[in-house]
Amino acid sequence: MDQPVASNQQKQTLNSEQRTPSDGLPLSVYMITYNNGVTIERALQSVADWADEVIVVDSYSTDGAQDIIPRYTEKLYQFETKDLREKYQYAHDQCINPWTLFIDADEWLMDDIKKEISTIIRGTPSCDGYIASRRNMYLGREIKHGGWYPDREIRLYRREKGRWEGGLHAKVTVDGTVGTLKHFYMHTPYADIAHQIRTIDRYSEAFAEDLRSSGRRFHLVNLITRPVYRFFRDYILKRGFLDGTPGFIIVVSTMYYVFMKYAKLWEIEMKEKKQFRDRF
């Protein structure tokens, strides 16, 4: 099976004018991935027989995801960058249909939201983009409180009206009117607690680098107070305690994530100071 493959050094991108959509639902679904072999098949299964086009942008996965993707789409691209916004925008740029929808490799769509989206696209849409709500499943339980709820963002939008902005927590912005979908899509962020810890380690490092590159400096008060604030906000004010043991694990792991991103910012600054001293 031929696969469109691109890298940030060698972008073999087909011009959208050279490609034409099929007679299916005029929707391009795209996702980015890296080592999501545990979850990506469910994500692909939920959209492969529904949308006209499914695009996946990988970063040279090594966990088997790269073998799963071609079973559901020929449009697999390889693209490496530390800039999450750039990777999402690259995936967006491969889309050819007038409407685009992005999902992550650990998310999937149920029939009700697919029917709603199909009705919008095949009808006369009143908006240029639509916010969708996400239902988060964690350790066998749907999380309905705390820092993970509510969880809403623009997911469906006209291709020519949307663009990606931001850094590590990049989001789509739409130049036009934005509505809200009635139905939810599903999300299982972690296969288990070990997977969660690995993800926290990766994201806290990326966040610390993003803070440093934007000129932010380490302050001890952030390391001390911000994790405590997150506990108070998410567990008490947002009633994370109502989600039982999973809710408590979530808030403690969130505190750990906040602590580690500022600890790693401090570590980056210490390495910079050492490099500066070693020059003399």
Specify the residue positions occupied by each region the protein language model found.
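N-proximal low-complexity "stem/linker" segments adjacent to membrane-targeting elements
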Residues: 1-46
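Active-site acidic short loop of glycosyltransferases
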Residues: 24, 74, 95-98, 126
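Short, conserved active-site loop motifs that form the nucleotide-linked donor/cofactor pocket
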Residues: 27, 74-75, 178
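Acidic helix N-cap motif at the loop->helix transition within catalytic regions
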Residues: 38-41, 63-72, 112-113
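A conserved acidic beta->alpha catalytic loop
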Residues: 46, 50, 58-67, 81, ...
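Conserved beta-strand positions in the Rossmann-like core of class I SAM-dependent methyltransferases
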Residues: 55
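Conserved donor nucleotide-binding strand/loop of the catalytic core
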Residues: 66-96
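Catalytic-site signature of metal-activated, phosphate-bearing donor transferases
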Residues: 86-92, 99-103, 110-272, 279-280
